[in-house]
Amino acid sequence: MDPQDEQLAYAYILGKDGGTPLIYSDDLPDSEDKDNGRWGNVWNSSTMKNMLSFHNAMQGKSMTMISSDQCTLLFKRGKEGVVGINKCGETRGVTVDTYQHEFNWHVQYKDVLSSATETVSSRYHTFNLPPRSARMFKL
């Protein structure tokens, strides 16, 4: 699997509700490792730590699917978190009716992966998802 696709999969697994995800880590000797250490200590990478932090913060929060198509997936966790995944090669915008899907207004949602922020301030808010990336916003 492409490493970027793997990161998008981790964002989905650690962003959604339910369960206790298991993170695969591989410490094979160099002679046996066909992935050049890709999974060695993955649980200890800053990206994985941030995804796990999001997962733990959203524990017990409901999950509501907001939008999905061939490229993007957007869901929220209570009013405290939003996960957006874009698997295509260009930026995609997902516009949300914040009356239909409740969000906290006028406070920053901060992405744990990139430090990008989103502030909902009107009925229709567009989450712009960069190409081949995930966003895990939390209050």
Map each language-model feature to its residues.
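Carbohydrate-interacting/catalytic domains
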Residues: M1-L139
